[in-house]
């Protein structure tokens, strides 16, 4: 997956779709009560990016629905996965609970709406395992509003770069043992040299353990240099989050990588393990 980073308005979304990205990451902000508000990152953000792009969440979800509904004039076949990077900083337990509930409501009302034909997969990406109440509330609300079958299109991710054994225990408490993406990364402003790759290697090794259920895919973020992308591919990542989707796709298409990998399409289930 070539995951376009920080896709927070319609113009940049179109630009990344034209580049060929098959996934996007969108930042979702919340009010202090936990109400989903808009697609917005704000400052600081990645180097060489404009941090203040924004659009209201209802309009954004409706637009995504158009882009991912076959037969719609705006349909873009290449958009498979949407990573919702949830900005939950400082929310109380009650606000986290409300946030999960309200995000489920908004997906039902503005993305799937009446016919449920919009086909993108969503990754509900929570910053910290201590904010797991959001996931619990989100899953419960989908069932209560009779959208439980859409759970087939929902995955989960914690992005705190913590020890995954602890993350697994949180998933066990939540009753989640599938549709799990794991990630490792750092802002593009800091060289990968300072971050290192040991945790990324550990996640990939854990994913590949026979019978292991708690990691379906591993992605790295935010990789904008050829050396970093090439290293990630050599390690066996399933996705690269980047500010330059066409650049990553170009590297993927080089003979040394295309013999093993190709860009994922809608026919490739993002919750199934890939076996080379």
Swiss-Prot record:
Single GO cellular component term: extracellular region
Location(s), subcellular: Secreted
Organism: Loxosceles aff. spinulosa (strain GJB-2008)
GO MF annotation list: lyase activity; metal ion binding; phosphoric diester hydrolase activity; toxin activity
Family: Belongs to the arthropod phospholipase D family. Class II subfamily.
Function: Dermonecrotic toxins cleave the phosphodiester linkage between the phosphate and headgroup of certain phospholipids (sphingolipid and lysolipid substrates), forming an alcohol (often choline) and a cyclic phosphate. This toxin acts on sphingomyelin (SM). It may also act on ceramide phosphoethanolamine (CPE), lysophosphatidylcholine (LPC) and lysophosphatidylethanolamine (LPE), but not on lysophosphatidylserine (LPS), and lysophosphatidylglycerol (LPG). It acts by transphosphatidylation, releasing exclusively cyclic phosphate products as second products.
Catalytic residue positions: 5, 41
The protein's name: Dermonecrotic toxin LafSicTox-betaIE2
InterPro entries in the cross-refs: PLC-like_Pdiesterase_TIM-brl
Enzyme Commission no: 4.6.1.-
Assigned keywords, A-Z: Cytolysis, Dermonecrotic toxin, Disulfide bond, Hemolysis, Lipid degradation, Lipid metabolism, Lyase, Magnesium, Metal-binding, Secreted, Toxin
Tissue-wise expression: Expressed by the venom gland.
Highest taxon, organism lineage: Eukaryota
Co-factor binding comment: Binds 1 Mg(2+) ion per subunit.
SS bonds (residue pairs): 45-51, 47-189
